[in-house]
């Protein structure tokens, strides 16, 4: 089993802070102009009244007034708010230090580019080989060793007294020879009986 993961690019966060004066830069999030080249409206009641009366009621919207107080409503810019870096939350992914309070920040744009390519190849090979033992048959058990066939009558008196077993006929009727063959015949009979019992 093999598992391979190919990560082409890790998630990255890039931020850009525009310092000092900016000339009508368009934000990628809102699409509004946040440049500082626009003029502040004079915060006095007469200018506010003149400005409001010069506009038609259909053109007056939430961006024209942030409160009912004329002195505070037009001290706020309609498109962007002037602030400094120390007053906001830093979302900078770099290790640079935050700018001083004298430097204004117009915009922080985020681009979250995530590209993960995963290739999972599962190669499995299973090989099973089984071999069963064959049962031993009785014929295979018996044919393992071929012993000479035992003849019960091989130790007869004629065989014992045969001249071929004597040394030039010297011990033809030797008593020890008779006892030996008699003992051998009894041992063969016992062996044959044991084989039959098995």
Swiss-Prot record:
Modification comment: O-glycosylated.
Residue ranges with Low complexity bias: 16-30
One Gene Ontology cellular component: host cell cytoplasm
Keywords noted in UniProt: Glycoprotein, Host cytoplasm, Magnesium, Metal-binding, Nucleotide-binding, Phosphoprotein, RNA-binding
Cofactor(s) recorded in Swiss-Prot or TrEMBL: Mg(2+)
Record's compositionally biased regions (Acidic residues): 153-166
Gene Ontology molecular function: ATP hydrolysis activity; magnesium ion binding; nucleotide binding; RNA binding
Pfam families cross-referenced by the UniProt entry: Rota_NS26
Annotated positions of the Phosphoserine modification: 67, 154, 156, 164, 166
Segments of skewed composition (Polar residues): 91-104
Region (Disordered) residue spans: 16-37, 53-72, 85-106, 123-166
Record text on cofactor binding: Magnesium is required for ATPase activity.
Protein residues bound to Mg(2+): 92
Subcellular location: Host cytoplasm
InterPro entries named among the record's database cross-references: Rotavirus_A/C_NSP5 (IPR002512)
Signal peptide: none
One of the protein's GO biological processes: viral genome replication
Subunit-level organization: Homodimer. Interacts with VP1. Interacts with VP2. Interacts with NSP2; this interaction leads to up-regulation of NSP5 hyperphosphorylation and formation of virus factories. Interacts with NSP6. Participates in the selective exclusion of host proteins from stress granules (SG) and P bodies (PB). Also participates in the sequestration of these remodeled organelles in viral factories.
Protein family (similarity comment): Belongs to the rotavirus NSP5 family.
Function: Plays an essential role in the viral genome replication. Participates, together with NSP2, in the formation of viral factories (viroplasms), which are large inclusions in the host cytoplasm where replication intermediates are assembled and viral RNA replication takes place. Orchestrates the recruitment of viroplasmic proteins such as capsid proteins to these factories. Participates in the selective exclusion of host proteins from stress granules (SG) and P bodies (PB). Also participates in the sequestration of these remodeled organelles in viral factories.
Protein name in UniProt: Non-structural protein 5
Species of origin: Rotavirus A (strain RVA/Cow/France/RF/1975/G6P6[1]) (RV-A)
Lineage of origin: Viruses, Riboviria, Orthornavirae, Duplornaviricota, Resentoviricetes
